[in-house]
From Swiss-Prot:
Any Gene Ontology CC annotation: membrane
Gene that specifies this protein: UBP27
Main function: Recognizes and hydrolyzes the peptide bond at the C-terminal Gly of ubiquitin. Involved in the processing of poly-ubiquitin precursors as well as that of ubiquitinated proteins.
Ranges annotated as spanning the membrane: 30-50
Record-listed E.C. numbers: 3.4.19.12
GO molecular-function terms, A-Z: cysteine-type deubiquitinase activity
Catalytic residues of the enzyme: 83, 440
Name by which UniProt lists this protein: Ubiquitin carboxyl-terminal hydrolase 27
Keywords: Hydrolase, Membrane, Protease, Thiol protease, Transmembrane, Transmembrane helix, Ubl conjugation pathway
CDD domains, sorted: Peptidase_C19F
Main location as per UniProt: membrane
């Protein structure tokens, strides 16, 4: 696991091991406190925020005892305030689909690109190598170095300073869009398809693929390159309840789902008992849109008005045959500008829907809030499940509201084939301590470990959780993980 940078990493491991061996509990407390700032640390300690500190201490005591279950994942060096990036790198290392996506891109490029991959796809190459390293479970402590990824990322995200404290969710989005930029530039259509058949529009959409199987495969390959595993699609629909029409339906890709917690009155605290399901429901709930003009409702009202005032049959027919599109000229051509009308007749609702379940689902709990004077952080626990069923939050057809859907799904047994559709397993939790814009990030990672005997029999996997604060790694229990005040949650589709 340390072969690529053998001597360098080994040296770091030695230094860290020595430091931990000599450390008593105060040294480990103080090194942690140094990261947070003393004030934040005292606050966190008073409020019991360091459930893991005891584990960290225990861990340093357990150094010499390398028993049968003392396997570990590598930590990551902090190269100066980059804990926000380290947690993202650890999180991505836990996402099997993300690691295999990077490997697939490199593999795919091997056939079509001339020259060294390290030169052509420097960020993909560096990230893939680091994530493989972080994904390797070992029996000894090791610490990996994120420097190469940081250097290559800086070339793309020039305005994103990686050495001053940043938001972890923002770092993830920068990393994804930088990768996208690199991968798209290096994309070459496969030899079997004709380059002239493939046109790219400015917004990175492939237009008019060549016909037949090759064209379809090329399109799939292009989408896979472009979107990666964070490939969810969010639909946004506007409906008019008054005339039961759909005004608009738009789709967009999403990398993360930003969910706001439920708040107590006043909006300074997260409501006790708030769950991730509550937040999802709130996010996907219909909301009333004010001051929006429904053309179909207007046409209905205009038809009644013309009949009442005894207008000519030809005028009524013109209105009736109009599709009620927002571009029509009924208002002016029929002199209806003065018709008494208020848009409050229409009841317009907006709703977001998850139109495609992503392979990897990243949920961003929006804890940053504002009042009149300043930005503040919403702290408090939001319960989240180990297994999430996202299909419960997706209306089967537009207009069916989510509560009805939940009732429906519990009433009727789903067919066997679609049983796992929309089912997700928790793989990583990112937690933030301290104030927004400063403080410290830590991460919980789940790692699947196969013991040798099990591998021979039926490959039963053993899921272990680790708490990681930069270079410090320790094993924790599932309940430690579920107790976290999550900022980011990564779920993998089952
Ligand atoms: Zn309407
Ligand atoms: Zn019209």
């Amino acid at each position: 696991m340390v072969s690529r940078r053998g001597s360098e990493t080994k040296a770091i491991v030695c230094v860290l091991t020595d430091r931990i061996r000599i450390s008593n509990q105060w040294v480990s407390h103080l090194s942690f406190a140094g990261l947070l700032g003393v004030a934040g640390f005292v606050f966190a300690q008073q409020h019991g925020l360091f459930r893991n500190l005891n584990n960290l201490k225990l861990f340093s005591g357990r150094e010499k005892d390398s028993g049968d279950d003392s396997f570990l994942v590598p930590g990551l060096q902090n190269l100066g305030n980059n804990c926000f990036l380290n947690v993202i790198l650890q999180a991505l290392a836990s996402c099997k689909d993300f690691r295999s996506f990077l490997q697939w891109v490199l593999e795919d490029a091997r056939g079509s690109l001339a020259g060294e991959q390290e030169e052509q796809l420097p960020l993909t190459f560096a990230l893939s190598a680091l994530l493989q390293e972080l994904g390797t479970v070992g029996s000894r402590r090791s610490v990996s170095n994120p420097r190469k990824v940081m250097v290559t990322l800086t070339d793309y995200a020039k305005n994103f300073n990686l050495t001053s404290q940043q938001d972890a969710a923002e770092a993830l989005l920068h990393l994804i869009s930088s990768l996208q930029e690199e991968i798209v530039v290096c994309y070459r259509p496969s030899q079997s398809s004709n380059l002239s058949d493939i046109l790219f529009s400015r917004n990175l959409r492939m237009l008019a693929p060549s016909e037949g199987l090759h064209g379809l495969m090329e399109l799939k390959r292009w989408h896979k390159h472009l979107r990666g595993p964070f490939d969810g699609i969010l639909g946004s629909t506007l409906m008019c309840r008054t005339c039961s029409s759909q005004i608009s339906l738009e789709f967009q890709f999403f990398h993360t789902l930003p969910l706001s917690p439920l708040l107590h009155h006043g909006g300074y605290n997260i409501m006790s008992g708030c769950t991730l399901e509550h937040c999802l429901k709130k996010f996907l709930n219909t909301e009333k849109v004010e001051n929006y003009f429904c053309y179909r409702c207007w046409h209905g009202a205009a038809l009644k008005y013309l009949s009442v005032i005894g207008a000519a049959e030809t005028e009524i027919e013109k209105l009736r045959s109009c599709g009620g599109e927002d571009q029509c000229d009924c208002k002016t051509s029929l002199h209806l500008q003065r018709m008494p009308w208020s848009n409050s007749y229409s009841h317009i609702l907006k709703q977001l829907i998850i139109a495609r379940f992503p392979k990897l689902l990243c949920i961003q709990v929006q804890r940053a809030s504002f009042n009149m004077f300043e930005e503040f952080k919403l702290s408090g626990h939001i319960a989240f499940p180990l297994v999430l069923n996202l299909s419960l939050f997706t209306p089967s057809s537009i207009g069916v509201n989510i509560e009805e859907r939940i009732e429906m799904s519990s009433e009727y047994q789903k067919p066997e084939a679609s049983k796992n559709h929309g089912m997700y397993r928790l793989v990583t939790v990112v937690e933030h301590f301290g104030r927004t814009g400063s403080g410290h990030y830590t991460v919980y990672r789940s790692v699947r470990v196969f013991s040798q005997e099990e591998e021979e029999e039926d490959c039963d996997e053993d899921l272990s959780w680790f708490s990681i604060s930069d270079s410090e790694v320790c094993r924790v229990s599932e309940s430690d993980v579920l107790g976290a005040e999550a900022s980011l949650l990564f779920y993998e589709r089952l």
